[in-house]
């Protein structure tokens, strides 16, 4: 049995939408491309056919991966959380104690992480350093670039 992997409700919904799109729209489009390429004759030297088959393989692989992720997901509705401590699903505002730069991070599951959107994985060094802390606490994060220090400013859900 696969261990359960934490995932936000939003993250699970995004994966379900991608899965639905890949099973319906993308699959149909790829099948049509394969059929069209087959109509061109000799498949051994048909680049369009091979490209479409490669797309099909990638799409089916991604479908299998999405189904696996959703099957092992422990979906957590973060809107129902309320804690003074940092836990999975929290949105945490911190100040870098060296640069005085303020940043906000949303602690999410591994598959949802997107640093550009401020979403960090629960298994990242930053999130691991935050878990259990409260507003006003200092965080020490050991990362490949060295140790950094932050102060927790605000925790929201």
From Swiss-Prot:
HAMAP family for this protein: GreA_GreB (MF_00105)
Q: Which UniProt keywords apply?
A: Coiled coil, DNA-binding, Transcription, Transcription regulation
Q: Which residues form a coiled coil?
A: 9-30
Q: Highest taxon of the source?
A: Bacteria
Instruction: Extract the PROSITE patterns matched here.
Output: GREAB_1 (PS00829), GREAB_2 (PS00830)
- Function field: Necessary for efficient RNA polymerase transcription elongation past template-encoded arresting sites. The arresting sites in DNA have the property of trapping a certain fraction of elongating RNA polymerases that pass through, resulting in locked ternary complexes. Cleavage of the nascent transcript by cleavage factors such as GreA or GreB allows the resumption of elongation from the new 3'terminus. GreA releases sequences of 2 to 3 nucleotides.
Protein name as it appears in the record: Transcription elongation factor GreA
Q: Which family does it belong to?
A: Belongs to the GreA/GreB family.
Is Transcription a UniProt keyword of this protein? Answer: yes
Among the Pfam families in the record, one is GreA_GreB
Its Gene Ontology biological processes?
DNA-templated transcription elongation; regulation of DNA-templated transcription elongation
Q: Which gene encodes it?
A: greA
Any one GO molecular-function label of the UniProt entry: DNA binding
**Record InterPro entries:** GreA/GreB_C_sf, TF_GreA/GreB_CS, Tscrpt_elong_fac_GreA, Tscrpt_elong_fac_GreA/B, Tscrpt_elong_fac_GreA/B_C, Tscrpt_elong_fac_GreA/B_fam, Tscrpt_elong_fac_GreA/B_N, Tscrpt_elong_fac_GreA/B_N_sf
User: What taxonomic lineage is listed for the species of origin?
Assistant: Bacteria, Pseudomonadati, Pseudomonadota, Alphaproteobacteria, Magnetococcales
Species whose genome carries this gene: Magnetococcus marinus (strain ATCC BAA-1437 / JCM 17883 / MC-1)
